[in-house]
């Protein structure tokens, strides 16, 4: 069996010595994880080696058949599958993809579905069949879809009613696209119906023995700078990395976890598939067609959800409601990542619910990189320490590790040996992949500070840093200060050209409704004074522009690049790099 083969490689980890941890991958094999090394099997497949393990435990009566997936649509319809049912259903999905669709190992499959159970089946089906899945949000328009299908040379797309027209508008311009698979109650010309095929498919599928380093997924980066790139992950960088990080959330096998994320974002697979099912826990999913804080609060009150994971904006939106009307009897773990968690969000959530929010940090390319685990002290404004498989450091422009308390670029050590968890590279873009290496480190493109305890503070995207009169100013510092003022609902801070200082801080501000009638000039002065009062005065925004919305990626991240490029273009000047 491939699990008994000699280990193919070692992944060196750097840092303080920690005791050995042993985690079950399945009943046939133990993987010993130590701070000094990791044993990496030659073959690994999350579906057969993790999911089917829990299914076998259920069949053998060694595990209660509790839900693995619990889905609700908010209108009274619910669905529950235990691990045996999930295993069989995903084998049906694999048979559809490799049988009815005729897809071959290594083919690329775009997946654009809302939060429906079929999303999880299709992803698992791809994993079983050795196909490369490429999740995308249903918010994409035809131009976004065309770019992704052409760039990836996808052989198939699995989509729902929400994007049929958008896909059909551009499908003829995608010569590689052969299969269109529709997840819907209705049929559509040119599309195979997934639900119909699922009813006819066999529940037995021979899982492909995939290599640990074999390509498993492609995620298009969010494009906060430039066009989205194709970040390729392997079976080990997703599945095995999840085994190594398992438990940081505090999740137990008997628990229920709700990850509030768009299905096109990597957070969705990390939280709602890899983390929960690695531990044998239940993934809770709400269809949630649109973000509605009242629906989220009602759901938390009505279902035995123990852990909730989402972006900080989820908590900020919930805090705008009257939380005194809701009780969360089961909720214990609140996790936030994807953007900076403002200290006041943490404080307000704790004050109103009695619960802490534990922050985590990562990227499409690296997965979970830093986190505040269940046993760690929470430091407001800090995103935790390095994940167990990574040596994360703050480095200078030559790749030297900087001492604690010094701002620099955040990097993960990838030499002399590349750690598990790092993506394989940008597809067909080796120059861009190589450009992100500085010395022995992979650059995350973020600025930060590491303190004496190993906690990291996020200072901003490296290309977002503002250099004004010799002062280097991180936009998140100014944004955090502005968000403490009741007039500010959302803000984005960029550099703006200045004839004397080179560049100055400019803030784009979305106002709360009750402040829309205020005098703009007076409110500008008030906000500037406010920033001076809560942070170093040199950071205050010398320019403020009130706007109704901010440019964002399809995953909801503010695109400071667009604001900055427009600002500098209007001035007719080029920004110094």
From Swiss-Prot:
GO terms for biological process: acyl-CoA metabolic process; fatty acid biosynthetic process; xenobiotic metabolic process. Substrate binds at residues 364, 472. Its main location: mitochondrion. SUPFAM superfamilies: Acetyl-CoA synthetase-like. InterPro entries: AMP-bd_C, AMP-bd_C_sf, AMP-binding_CS, AMP-dep_synth/lig_dom, ANL_N_sf, Mitochondrial_ACSM. Optimum pH is 8.8. The keyword Magnesium applies. Its EC number is 6.2.1.2, 6.2.1.25. GO terms for molecular function: ATP binding; benzoate-CoA ligase activity; CoA-ligase activity; decanoate-CoA ligase activity; fatty acid ligase activity; fatty-acyl-CoA synthase activity; metal ion binding. The keyword ATP-binding applies. Belongs to the ATP-dependent AMP-binding enzyme family. This is Acyl-coenzyme A synthetase ACSM2B, mitochondrial.
């Amino acid at each position: 069996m491939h699990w008994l083969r000699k280990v193919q490689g070692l992944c060196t980890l750097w840092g303080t010595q920690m005791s050995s941890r042993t985690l079950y991958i399945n009943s046939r094999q133990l993987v010993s994880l130590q701070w000094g090394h990791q044993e990496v099997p030659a073959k690994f497949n999350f579906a057969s080696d993790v999911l089917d393990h829990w299914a076998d435990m259920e069949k053998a009566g060694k595990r209660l058949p509790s839900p693995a997936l619990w889905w609700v649509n908010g209108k009274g319809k619910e669905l529950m599958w235990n691990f045996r049912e999930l295993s069989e259903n995903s084998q049906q999905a694999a048979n559809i993809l490799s049988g009815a669709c005729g897809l071959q190992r290594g083919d690329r499959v775009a997946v654009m579905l809302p939060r429906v159970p079929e999303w999880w089946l299709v992803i698992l089906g791809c994993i079983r069949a050795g196909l490369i899945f490429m999740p995308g949000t249903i918010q994409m328009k035809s131009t976004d879809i065309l770019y992704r299908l052409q760039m990836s040379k996808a052989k198939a797309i699995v989509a729902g009613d929400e994007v049929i027209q958008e896909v059909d508008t551009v499908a003829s311009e995608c010569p590689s696209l052969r299969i269109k698979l529709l997840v819907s109650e209705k049929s559509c010309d040119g599309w195979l119906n997934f639900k119909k095929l699922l009813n006819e498919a066999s529940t037995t599928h021979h899982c492909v023995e995939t290599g640990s380093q074999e390509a498993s997924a492609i995620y298009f980066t969010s494009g906060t700078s430039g066009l989205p790139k194709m970040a390729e992950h392997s079976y080990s960088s997703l599945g095995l990395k999840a085994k190594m990080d398992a438990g940081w959330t505090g999740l137990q096998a008997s628990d229920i976890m709700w990850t509030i994320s768009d299905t096109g974002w990597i957070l969705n697979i990390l939280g709602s598939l890899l983390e929960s099912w690695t531990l044998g826990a239940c993934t809770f999913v709400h269809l949630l067609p649109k973000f509605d804080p009242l629906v989220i609060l009602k759901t938390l009150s009505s279902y035995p959800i123990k852990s909730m994971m989402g972006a900080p904006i989820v908590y900020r939106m919930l805090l705008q409601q009257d939380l005194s009307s809701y009780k969360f009897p089961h909720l214990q773990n609140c996790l936030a990542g994807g953007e900076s968690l403002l200290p006041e969000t943490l404080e307000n959530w704790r004050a109103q619910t009695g619960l802490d929010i534990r922050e985590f940090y990562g990227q499409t390319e690296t997965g979970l990189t830093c986190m505040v685990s269940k046993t760690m002290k929470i430091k407001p404004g800090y995103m935790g320490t390095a994940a167990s498989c990574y040596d994360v450091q703050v480095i200078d422009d030559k790749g030297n590790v900087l001492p604690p308390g010094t701002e620099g670029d955040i990097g993960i050590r990838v030499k002399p040996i590349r750690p598990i968890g790092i993506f394989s590279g940008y597809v067909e873009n080796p120059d861009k992949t190589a450009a992100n290496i500085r010395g022995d480190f992979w650059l995350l493109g973020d600025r930060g500070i590491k303190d004496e305890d190993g906690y990291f503070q996020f200072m901003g995207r490296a290309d977002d840093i503002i250099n004004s009169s010799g002062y280097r100013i991180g936009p998140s510092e100014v944004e955090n200060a502005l968000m403490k003022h009741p007039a500010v609902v959302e803000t984005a801070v960029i550099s703006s050209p200045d004839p004397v200082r080179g560049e100055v801080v400019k803030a784009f501000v979305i106002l709360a409704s009750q402040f829309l009638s205020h005098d703009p000039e007076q409110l500008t002065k008030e906000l500037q004074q406010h920033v001076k009062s809560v942070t170093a005065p040199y950071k205050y925004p010398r320019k403020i522009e009130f706007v109704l919305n901010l440019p964002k990626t399809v995953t909801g991240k503010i695109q400071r690049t667009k604001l900055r490029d427009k600002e500098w273009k209007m001035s007719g000047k080029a920004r110094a790099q």
